[in-house]
Amino acid sequence: MSSRIGLSLAAAAALLAVAQVSAHHGAGVFEPEKKVTVEGTVTDFQFVNPHVLVYMTVKGDDGKEVQWGGELTSPNRLARDARAVKWHKSILKPGDHITITGHPARNGAPMMDILKIVDGQGTVLIDDQ
């Protein structure tokens, strides 16, 4: 009897682990069939694992400032990607003007899975569209 309980608990734990990994690597929080583009000023840039994070202030349709956030792949992948500018921890700084395009959050929050970033000089830093 106790071996069946132990086996059941082990199976349940394995299923939970698979669900967590799938949820983390899935794009469930974003809408892959939609794209949005916003333009604004970098407020924070975090070149950290597991995902590089970009935060910016964008002027909304009503003229009010909106804080947007977005995520990219890992720093290692960005630094080694031959299709993109070589990324490093100071490629973006607070005050930089950028335009980002990506898949928006399903819940309407001002965040996205970033596909493309263009800096204020028109340099494409990444384009995974």
Please identify what each model-predicted range represents.
Residues V38-V42:
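Conserved hydrophobic positions within beta-strands
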Residues S22-V36:
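Short boundary/loop segments of OB/S1/cold-shock single-stranded nucleic-acid-binding domains
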Residues H103-D128:
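OB-fold/S1-family single-stranded nucleic acid-binding modules
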